[in-house]
C-alpha cells in the first residue's frame, strides 16, 4: 500500500510547526511584527526548505523584513537540528507569501466586473 504523504511532505509539515514556534518565542525582533509561516516547501532531496511567510504589523518594508528574517536562519537550523530527527537539516530560505494580496486583487477584479454587469 503506498504512503499517503511523501517524506518531504512530512518534513515540511513538521518544519512548519517548529519554525512557527521558533519565530513566536525564539527571536527578539519587534520590527518584524507578527510573522506567520503559511507554508514550507522542502525539495525532494531535503537539501533546501523554502519558508513562505507573511507579516502583520511589520515596521519594515517586505523585502527588508524577509532579509531580516533570513539573519535568523543559522540559529533556526541549530534549533531544528535539536528538535527534528534528521541527519541533515535543510538550508532555510525565506520568501514572502503574496497569495493573500493576489486573492484580494482577484476579488476586487471580480467585484468590478460584476458591478459593471460583465459577469
Swiss-Prot record:
<comment type="function">
    <text>One of several proteins that assist in the late maturation steps of the functional core of the 30S ribosomal subunit. Associates with free 30S ribosomal subunits (but not with 30S subunits that are part of 70S ribosomes or polysomes). Required for efficient processing of 16S rRNA. May interact with the 5'-terminal helix region of 16S rRNA.</text>
</comment>
<dbReference type="InterPro" id="IPR000238">
    <property type="entry name" value="RbfA"/>
</dbReference>
<dbReference type="Pfam" id="PF02033">
    <property type="entry name" value="RBFA"/>
</dbReference>
<dbReference type="InterPro" id="IPR023799">
    <property type="entry name" value="RbfA_dom_sf"/>
</dbReference>
<comment type="similarity">
    <text>Belongs to the RbfA family.</text>
</comment>
<keyword id="KW-0690">Ribosome biogenesis</keyword>
<dbReference type="GO" id="GO:0030490">
    <property type="term" value="P:maturation of SSU-rRNA"/>
</dbReference>
<dbReference type="InterPro" id="IPR015946">
    <property type="entry name" value="KH_dom-like_a/b"/>
</dbReference>
<dbReference type="GO" id="GO:0005829">
    <property type="term" value="C:cytosol"/>
</dbReference>
<keyword id="KW-0963">Cytoplasm</keyword>
<dbReference type="GO" id="GO:0043024">
    <property type="term" value="F:ribosomal small subunit binding"/>
</dbReference>
<dbReference type="InterPro" id="IPR020053">
    <property type="entry name" value="Ribosome-bd_factorA_CS"/>
</dbReference>
<comment type="subunit">
    <text>Monomer. Binds 30S ribosomal subunits, but not 50S ribosomal subunits or 70S ribosomes.</text>
</comment>
<protein>
    <recommendedName>
        <fullName>Ribosome-binding factor A</fullName>
    </recommendedName>
</protein>
Amino acid at each position: 500500500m503506498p504512503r499517503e504523504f511523501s517524506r518531504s511532505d512530512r518534513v515540511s509539515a513538521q518544519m512548519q510547526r517548529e519554525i512557527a514556534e521558533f519565530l513566536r518565542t525564539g527571536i527578539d525582533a519587534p520590527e518584524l511584527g507578527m510573522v506567520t509561516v503559511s507554508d514550507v516547501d522542502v525539495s525532494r532531496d531535503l537539501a533546501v526548505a523554502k519558508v513562505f511567510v507573511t507579516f502583520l504589523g511589520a515596521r519594515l518594508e517586505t523585502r527588508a523584513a524577509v532579509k531580516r528574517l533570513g539573519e535568523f536562519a543559522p540559529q533556526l537550523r541549530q534549533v531544528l537540528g535539536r528538535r527534528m530527527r534528521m541527519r541533515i537539516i535543510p538550508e532555510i530560505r525565506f520568501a514572502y507569501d503574496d497569495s493573500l494580496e493576489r486573492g484580494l486583487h482577484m476579488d476586487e477584479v471580480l467585484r468590478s466586473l460584476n458591478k459593471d454587469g460583465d459577469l
